[in-house]
A protein has these predicted regions:
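N-terminal Rossmann NAD(P)H-binding glycine-rich loop of SDR-like oxidoreductase domains
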Residues: 6-24
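C-terminal amphipathic/interface module of NAD(P)-dependent oxidoreductases
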Residues: 251-265
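NAD(P)-cofactor binding segment of oxidoreductase domains
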Residues: 73-101
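Mid/C-terminal beta-alpha module of Rossmann-like enzyme folds, strongest
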Residues: 195-196, 202-247, 251
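NAD(P)H-binding glycine-rich loop region in Rossmannoid oxidoreductase-like domains
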Residues: 44-81
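Adenosine-cofactor binding site in Rossmann-like domains, unifying the SAM/SAH pocket
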Residues: 25, 31-49
């Protein structure tokens, strides 16, 4: 990135926000790092005031309500954070001629497919989380013509709730029950952060799927986490309805990074 460009990362204390910060902090860019305590993205005036005062060249929205169960329990809060927040940031980006980067999810698909979803497949979310994130995508497209939307899946790394839960149970030697009928692509937060930065720098505006390589079930993912931990803890495959560590998600939400391949990124 060019010297003195300003990058505003909203949700800077989250998994992806932290990794982006680590990757950019020793570069010539000026980082503007906020979380809800500094700027509440659901407050349109606070967002406009901060953007107007700091005039970022990029606004990266890593903030969001990502707890799927919590979204189901509080629909209004989910849409307020994931949709209205994205709208507020998009409006600020348009007003300041900044480029808007929106992080989204595989949950925008219904899981009924049997082949990986591309950027050209029609979303049909079944959860409040997925619906609120899709609404956020639509607001970004409506209010800011200079935008990149990044969909990813099963993001793991420092602070990952599922990863941490499995590691904790493995450390305690407790039997782990994991869904064998939920399949997607685990994606490292570091890998995702690197690709987002690359897209910010050189990619045309639009929608991109960005995931790791190779799909697996929650059960297989848990098995690999336990293996890496060195634990001998038993991992038992169960149906998603019996998996207490994760909320209901699409049964199949493997993303195909088609636009990355076609764009040579």
């Amino acid at each position: 990135m060019n010297h003195m460009q300003k990058v505003w990362i909203c949700g800077a204390n989250g998994r992806v926000g932290r990794k982006m910060t680590e990757l950019l902090e020793n570069t010539p860019v000026e980082l503007l790092l906020t979380d809800i305590d500094a700027v509440d993205i659901t407050d349109s005036k606070a967002v406009r005031d901060y953007a107007g005062m700091n005039r970022p060249h990029f606004i990266v929205n890593c903030a969001g309500l990502t707890d799927v169960a919590a979204c189901e329990e509080n629909k209004e809060e989910a849409f307020k954070v994931n949709a209205l927040g994205a709208r507020n940031l998009s409006v600020a980006a348009r007003m300041g001629k900044a480029r808007m980067i929106q992080l989204s999810t595989d949950d925008v698909f219904d899981g009924s497919g049997q082949t990986p979803y591309t950027e050209f497949d029609t979303p049909n979310p079944q959860t409040i989380y997925g619906k609120s994130k899709l609404a956020g995508e639509n607001f970004v497209k409506e209010f800011c013509n200079r935008h990149i939307i990044v969909r990813s899946s099963w993001i793991f790394g420092e602070g990952s709730s599922y990863f941490s839960k499995i590691m904790k149970l493995a450390g305690e030697g407790q039997t782990i029950y994991a869904a064998a009928d939920q399949t997607a692509v685990p994606t490292g937060a570091s890998e995702l952060a690197e690709k987002i930065i690359e897209l910010m720098e050189s990619a045309p505006d639009g929608l991109y799927h960005v995931t790791g390589q190779g799909s697996c079930s929650r059960y297989e993912f848990a098995q690999e986490i336990v293996r890496l931990s060195g634990s001998q803890t038993e991992v038992v495959p169960v149906a998603a309805v019996d998996d207490r560590l994760t909320a209901m998600r699409p049964s199949y939400s493997v993303l195909d990074n088609m636009m990355l391949r076609m764009s040579g990124i």
